[in-house]
Structure formats: structure tokens, C-alpha cells
Design a protein with these regions (language model features):
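Active-site neighborhood of phospho(di)ester-bond hydrolases with catalytic His/Asp-centered motifs
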Residues: 1-2, 30-35, 64-71, 104-108, ...
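Binuclear metal-dependent hydrolase catalytic cores centered on His/Asp/Glu-rich metal-binding motifs
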Residues: 79-80, 87-91, 101-102, 114-166, ...
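Solvent-exposed loop/turn segments at secondary-structure junctions
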Residues: 6, 36-39, 71-75, 111, ...
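Short, electropositive alpha-helical surface patch
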Residues: 57, 84-101, 120, 124-126, ...
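Membrane-embedded segments
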Residues: 1-104
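Short, well-ordered beta-strand micro-motif
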Residues: 112, 120, 226-228, 263-265
Length: 285
């Protein structure tokens, strides 16, 4: 699950409903590829910060939680004389999250146990072209991936499932990117909010395109990819909060866009491929 965009509009009722749904699904791992918070402003108050940490703590009691970093997790609404991108401030929140039991926040880091290997790569503000709004930059993506420690990308454990959590999927199907990530089984992303595609159309239209992207591009690709072919590695997860606090008054439309989760089920039987069964869950909370 992805893109919670934690803010005042994400009520305790919604958080409890998410925890209840996770308990029903009973996963071994919860993978969250970024945008846990809407902006850093939303966790300035200690009460709100603790509300978020308590939610993650409860998730960690259900399954191993692995998070990566999204663009909203590093951003604060700009004030006079200050930039909106405040990575150092975000790092303090990341450390508080890492202090929770069974919760692992990966900021260009790796999680590994007896079953899985998981990279959490952070696309930096430079990738998002912070000085020009959200304009994603593929050369920066390639440069940042190449600058990661070689051991993060190559000679990976063959018998373990290998995941790369990368918030934005925009360029993840490009040949150059796929080559750098060739040893991974799956890329898990969010960011696109299912291309703001209503659930009924999401189920009926067999395409990776959505209606609109965060950069306001129409019919964007890689908006809602669901591993339709054996060669496909990219799973783009829809949002827990489609219209977030930052884009008032559109957040009133959340009533028509249920929260989304994707459950990946893997078989222990020998098969042609490790391609998992994907179950889509839509809930209005």
C-alpha cells in the first residue's frame, strides 16, 4: 500500500480501518513505497506525530513493515525565505520511525531477511526538479541509481524474492533503468494515485495508463501497472488517499475514490514464473 498522505484529513477512524483490513489480509510483509505524509507541516505538532507513529507501530505488530521515501515525505509548504524541500528535517522523522519495532524505513538502504531482499531507493529533490515544480528527470534517476553501492544492485541472493521500492514509476520501464535493476524480481511504486482512475474503470480497462499524472500529464503511462505479463516487473500501487490535503478543495472527491491496497500472493510450488497473484482491495473509510 502507498501514498497515505498523512494529514489532519486522515482520521483515526481511517487509520484503524486500515489496520483492521491488514489484520484480515494477514500479510507477512507490508511494503509502502513513499508519501507516508502529505507534508512535513502535518507532523509538526507532537500529537499528530505521535498519531502517525502509533499507526505504524500497530502495523508493525501485524507484519514486517518496509517503507521507502516519496517526494512528499521530504517537503514542507514553503515559507518566506525557506525552500519547501527540507531533507534534514525529514531525516529526524525517519529516525523516529526506525525506532519502532518491526518497522524499517529505507532511505537508499537495504532490508534483508531469510525470505526477501528489499532496496528502498530515494529519488532526491534534484530528480523531481525542485526548482521548477515536479518535473521528473530521467538522467538524474540513472545517475543516482549508478551511485548506489554496487552490492545493492548486483550479486543479489538468488533464492530470495527481491523487491525495489521506488516511489515514482515514471521511468522504471525504460531499458536503461531496467538494466540497472535487472537482478530484482519486482519494482514496487506509488506516486501516480492510479492515474486518478475511478475503481470501476480501473477494473474494466486493461491498460497501464491513467487519466492524469501528478505532473498534470494526460493519459500517463505506468500509472496502474499490475504485472499482467510474465516479463513485467513493475507494480504501481494505488493511493490510500487519492486527493490529499495539499490540493484543496479536490480532497472532497475522496468519497468517490476508495483507498487502495494490493495483496501479492506467492506460491511455494515450482512454476514457470514467480509471477504472483494480485488481489486488489478498494475500501471507503
Amino acid at each position: 500500500m502507498s501514498d497515505l498522505h498523512f494529514s489532519y484529513q486522515v482520521t483515526n477512524q481511517k487509520l484503524q480501518a486500515i489496520i483492521k483490513q491488514v489484520k484480515t489480509l494477514a500479510p507477512d510483509y507490508i511494503l509502502m513505497p513513499g508519501d507516508l505524509i502529505d507534508t512535513l507541516d502535518m507532523v509538526d505538532k507532537n500529537s499528530e506525530r505521535q498519531r502517525l507513529l502509533n499507526f505504524l507501530k500497530k502495523l508493525g505488530q501485524q507484519a514486517t513493515v518496509i517503507l521507502s521515501v516519496g517526494n512528499h515525505d521530504m517537503y514542507r509548504k514553503p515559507t518566506e525565505g525557506q525552500t519547501g524541500w527540507q531533507y534534514e528535517v525529514a531525516s529526524k522523522l525517519f529516525d523516529e520511525i526506525r525506532a519502532l519495532d518491526n518497522v524499517f524505513l529505507l532511505d537508499n538502504q537495504v532490508y534483508e531477511d531469510e525470505n526477501i531482499y528489499c532496496l528502498g531507493y530515494t529519488q532526491s529533490p534534484k530528480y523531481y526538479r525542485a526548482d521548477k515544480g515536479i518535473v521528473e528527470d530521467m538522467p538524474v534517476l540513472l545517475s543516482e541509481l549508478e551511485s548506489l553501492p554496487e552490492k545493492y544492485l548486483t550479486h543479489l541472493p538468488e533464492k530470495k524474492l527481491k523487491f525495489a521500492l521506488i516511489h515514482s514509476p515514471v521511468y522504471l520501464n525504460q531499458p536503461e533503468v531496467k538494466y540497472l535493476l535487472r537482478e530484482f524480481d519486482y519494482f514496487i511504486s506509488g506516486h501516480m494515485h492510479n492515474g486518478v482512475m475511478p475503481p470501476v474503470l480501473d477494473e474494466l480497462i486493461n491498460s497501464s495508463r491513467g487519466l492524469i499524472s501528478p505532473t498534470k500529464k494526460w493519459a500517463p503511462e505506468n500509472s496502474r501497472n499490475t504485472l499482467r505479463t510474465y516479463a513485467d516487473k513493475l507494480l504501481v500501487v494505488g493511493a490510500l488517499t487519492t486527493f490529499h490535503e495539499c490540493i484543496k478543495p479536490f480532497n472532497k472527491l475522496n468519497a468517490f475514490f476508495p483507498s487502495y491496497m494490493a495483496l501479492m500472493e506467492f506460491t511455494t510450488k515450482k512454476t514457470y514464473s514467480r509471477k504472483p497473484y494480485i488481489k486488489h482491495i478498494y475500501k471507503n473509510w
